[in-house]
């Protein structure tokens, strides 16, 4: 038996040249032209080049490895490493080291067109930003002993470093996920688990093993830490609780997924009900249909454990003893933090749910790769529809339609009176509505050449938050090997 072999398996190389136009030279590209693109697209009208090469795991080997490199250049950023990683796999364990994007769920007729979901199936890591350098140790589903294959565990553990300009420079990121999967009969799977992140270190605290242990265990800071970290937990913690049902048949797969965001213990105790992202997806296993995949999502994040959060310390900084009438669970303020003020963003873009617009979006002062103070809009109500298939059973496409009502944050509402500090329901809040649409597609095998493909995109924004405009993108992809 060959334990290790450096043979190349399914080598793939691709070059994409693309141009994009918006409603004006100073306007940002429409929402879906730059959202969910791993930060590759320019923020305004311009051009983009993306070249990549990678290999795949060889399942015939006991120990398998793969590598990948990618370089992106656009009219806003001259060039940057999109991916650069080396991965090894042994049985159920996979170690990825370097710059590597997380793979998305709910893909349609062509993986190259991306996910049909706003979040890519991951509320916390949606594929909206560039990759961070670090490592991720993943565990594929492993059966729990004595359950006769009915129960399995899977997840990952990882640590990364931020490289962008931030309020706390050189902040570190700890990531972790753990899921329990139950197999019921031949067709039904139930999944339940946590997807967690923590920002720590950087110029805000020492990055040592002592603090790392307190971060991963969710402990409070020592006396040398900030007052906030001594009261709550060390660093900025957030994540999502996920519940998923998946029914698989030979010809189709149906999935329902419910993701609940949290940014403190109150969210983990479901005090923020009914906040969450609800996803319903139906897909045929054969993708050469006019419509092969249908996805609907309902987003609601207005509650955030309520608008009341009383002071936890007195004027002298002493902790006030908790009592039953004390409201300290409200104002979760997803993806924002008072100390790590860049929040859950990277290179100016929201890492998680991209309907949480980064600060400066509505005022049109936002620019990628600049210092951003978190998100300005994390209280939303939204409906999203994604469709995919193949025109004439050979040309993959993806249709995205998103309507949202946006309330800003509790502390800084977009419009009307703020509900912060007032009993729930006593204030009639005023949202700003927004509609964004996109049709993306590919025309494969131009001029009869299997390696040459045309890519296109038509985009539109209309509403009260983003500039009302149309946009278009057109590109040529040259690729060899299996995507």
Please tell me what each predicted stretch does:
Residues 69-164, 182-200:
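Outer membrane beta-barrel
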Residues 12, 17, 134, 467-483:
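Outer-membrane beta-barrel "beta-signal"
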Residues 15, 19-27, 65-73, 88, ...:
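Transmembrane beta-barrel strands of outer-membrane/channel proteins
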Residues 309-414:
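C-terminal structural cap/anchor segments
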Residues 140-323, 403-430, 439:
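Signature for the C-terminal beta-barrel architecture of outer-membrane proteins
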Residues 49-57, 84-88, 135-141, 178-184, ...:
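Residues on the lipid-exposed face of transmembrane beta-strands in outer-membrane beta-barrel proteins
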Residues 4, 8-13, 54-67, 89-92, ...:
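Short loop/turn motifs that connect adjacent beta-strands in outer-membrane beta-barrel proteins
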Residues 43-51, 78-82, 128-138, 170-176, ...:
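Residues that define the transmembrane beta-barrel architecture of outer-membrane proteins
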């Amino acid at each position: 038996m060959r334990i290790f072999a450096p043979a190349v398996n399914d080598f793939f190389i691709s070059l994409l040249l693309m141009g994009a136009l918006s409603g004006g030279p100073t306007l940002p590209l429409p929402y879906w032209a730059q959202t969910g693109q791993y930060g590759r697209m320019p923020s305004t009208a311009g051009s983009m080049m993306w070249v990549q090469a990678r290999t795949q795991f060889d399942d015939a080997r006991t120990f398998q490895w793969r590598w990948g490199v990618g370089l992106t250049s656009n009219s806003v950023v001259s060039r940057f490493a999109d991916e650069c990683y080396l991965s090894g796999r042994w049985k159920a364990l996979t170690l990825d080291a370097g710059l590597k994007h997380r793979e998305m769920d709910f893909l349609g007729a062509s993986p190259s067109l991306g996910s049909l979901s706003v979040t890519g199936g991951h509320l916390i890591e949606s594929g909206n930003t560039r990759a961070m350098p670090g490592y991720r140790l993943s565990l594929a589903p492993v059966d729990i002993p004595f359950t006769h294959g009915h129960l399995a565990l899977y997840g990952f553990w990882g640590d990364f470093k931020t490289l962008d300009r931030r309020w706390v420079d050189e902040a570190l990121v700890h990531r972790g996920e753990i899921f329990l999967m139950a197999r019921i009969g031949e067709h039904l799977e139930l999944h339940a688990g946590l997807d967690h992140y923590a920002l720590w270190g950087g110029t805000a605290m020492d990055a040592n093993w002592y603090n790392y242990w307190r971060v991963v265990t969710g402990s409070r800071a020592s006396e040398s830490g900030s007052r906030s970290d001594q009261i709550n937990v060390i660093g900025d913690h957030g994540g999502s609780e996920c519940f998923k049902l998946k029914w698989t048949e030979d010809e189709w797969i149906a999935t329902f997924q419910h993701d609940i965001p949290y940014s403190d213990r109150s969210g983990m105790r479901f005090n923020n009900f009914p906040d969450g992202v609800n996803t319903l997806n139906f897909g045929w296993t054969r993708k050469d249909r006019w419509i092969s995949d249908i996805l609907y999502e309902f987003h609601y994040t207005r509650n955030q454990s309520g608008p009341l959060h009383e002071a936890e310390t007195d004027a002298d900084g002493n902790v006030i003893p908790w009592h039953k009438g004390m409201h300290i669970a409200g104002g979760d303020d997803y993806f924002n933090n008072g100390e790590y003020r860049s929040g859950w963003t990277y290179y100016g873009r929201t890492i998680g749910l991209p309907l949480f617009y980064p600060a400066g979006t509505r005022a049109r002062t936002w620019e990628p790769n600049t210092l951003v103070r978190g998100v300005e809009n994390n209280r939303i109500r939204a409906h999203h529809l994604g469709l995919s298939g193949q025109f004439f059973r050979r040309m993959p496409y993806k249709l995205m339609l998103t309507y949202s009502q946006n309330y800003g944050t509790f502390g800084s509402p977009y419009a009307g009176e703020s509900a912060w500090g007032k009993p729930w329901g006593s204030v009639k809040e005023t949202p700003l509505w927004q509609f964004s649409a996109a049709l993306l597609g590919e025309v494969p095998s131009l001029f009869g050449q299997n390696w040459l493909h045309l890519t296109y995109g038509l985009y539109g924004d209309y509403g009260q938050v983003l500039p009302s405009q149309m946009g278009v993108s057109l590109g040529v992809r040259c690729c060899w090997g299996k995507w």
